Design a protein with these regions (language model features):
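Conserved catalytic core of the tyrosine transesterase superfamily
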Residues: 1-405
Length: 405
């Protein structure tokens, strides 16, 4: 069998994976693994290759199931963790695929429902310009509707009663907000079906609106002391601290949504003009001024925090290999961790957006200007913040009839 001596790791790789050890190491380094981690991962690869040789397996036989089988036969550490890294070993599959070793697996023919849902997703992304995360949510709701009313994706016999019953079925066990989301997705799917000629009638109106009471409490941000505590909790002597500090400052000073922060790319920053391009909801693109302190924090992270040689164009990346974009969940996790470090009540990233709006209300900024800063498509979204300034509301409140008697 092929043999390759890994002088740096001290591991001798025997078996079917030996010829690919060099490319595997290159890929690990490209994904942000440290030299020490690369040594460990190569040793894990040597154990996997030896196991495959004992099982009389070729490199083309390797897949995720084989890797899990190999890991399942290894003893666990005292803390219950694996002695080998599953995340690292799975990356050998990419090396084998790039080398043309792996045979392309025959894909199962998609069902009529999945074909229809794939077409609906393309419609959402290309025609409606919705965010990819929103498209995923809408497709999931449309899939549930099809499972109930048209398992074979035959929509010609669909009636308004079918639509109404589906909404009632969801509302019987879900919250008003969840039901409202289902109705929005269902209406979009029914409009798509009519446009494509799949239904003889436009049935979206049959998905009745869900009454939702206006929330009794005004939108709440966090006070300045808590905001300062979040920023101070970041250890800017470390890479992760510089990254988290920049993220928190972007959320607090620009009022971006978590997904918008996670989607920021290097080319979105115009350093000469002092502006940043934000890709918002509905495919809308906005150019915002970049405050000096925010720009300095981002530059400090890019120079002395962002993984060197990262091929990704997203600005904010994971610190732990394999490097990749944080995304919406990662940005929210940064906020939660900062709350835990600072000892302040746990909040989500969107509360920091509310914080900016509340601060603008406190200093007398008009609602149209708040809507402009937060990039609300409708002024009604900003009207909620009018309830934040209680003193101003008292000044314009009318006396209760007969209240002075």
């Amino acid at each position: 069998m092929a043999r390759r001596n890994r002088g740096r790791s001290g591991a001798v790789i025997r078996g079917p994976l030996a010829p690919f050890a060099g490319d595997y190491e290159i890929q690990l380094r490209a994904r942000g693994y440290s030299s020490r981690s690369v040594v460990c991962e190569v040793r894990y690869l040597a154990r996997l290759s030896q196991w495959m040789e004992n099982c009389r397996l070729n490199a083309a036989d390797l897949n995720v199931e084989r890797i899990d089988e190999f890991l399942g036969g290894l003893p666990r550490r005292r803390d219950g963790g694996r002695v080998c890294s599953r995340r690292g070993l799975i990356q050998i599959l990419g090396v084998l695929d790039d080398s043309g070793v792996l045979c392309p697996q025959a894909e199962k023919p998609a069902s009529p429902s999945e074909v229809l849902l794939a077409s609906f997703e393309r419609f959402l992304l290309q025609e409606r310009a919705v965010a990819p995360s929103t498209a995923v949510v809408y497709v999931a709701r449309a899939r549930r509707f099809l499972d109930w009313c048209a398992p074979n994706a035959e929509l010609g016999g669909l009636t308004a009663n079918d639509v109404i019953n589906a909404v009632l079925r969801v509302s019987a066990s879900a919250s008003p907000s969840t039901t409202k989301l289902f109705v929005s997705a269902l209406r979009s799917f029914l409009r798509f079906s009519f446009v494509e000629g799949l239904t003889p009638n436009e049935l979206s109106a049959a998905a009745l609106s869900v009454p939702r009471r206006r929330r009794s409490s005004p939108p709440m941000g966090i006070d300045r002391r808590a905001a300062d505590a979040l920023l101070r909790s970041c250890d800017r002597r470390r890479s992760v601290g510089r990254r988290d500090y920049a993220i928190l400052l972007v959320l607090l000073r620009l009022g971006l949504r978590a997904g918008e922060v996670g989607g920021l790319c290097l080319q979105d920053f115009d350093w000469r003009a002092g502006e940043v391009t934000v890709h918002g909801k509905g495919g809308r693109v906005h150019r915002l001024p970049l405050p000096t302190d925010v720009g300095e924090a981002i530059v400090a992270y890019l120079r002395r925090g962002r993984p060197n040689g990262a091929a990704r164009r997203e600005a904010f990346l994971r610190v732990v290999a394999p490097t990749g974009p944080l995304g919406t969940n990662g940005i929210s996790r940064v906020v939660r961790c900062a709350c835990s470090r600072a000892g302040v009540p746990m909040v989500r990233a969107h509360r920091l957006r509310h914080t900016l709006a509340c601060q603008m209300v406190e200093v007398g900024v008009a609602l149209p200007e708040i809507a402009l800063v937060l990039r609300h498509s409708s002024l009604s979204s900003s009207v909620e913040y009018a309830r934040v300034d209680i003193q101003a509301l008292r000044a314009v409140a009318q006396p209760w009839p007969g209240g002075d008697r």
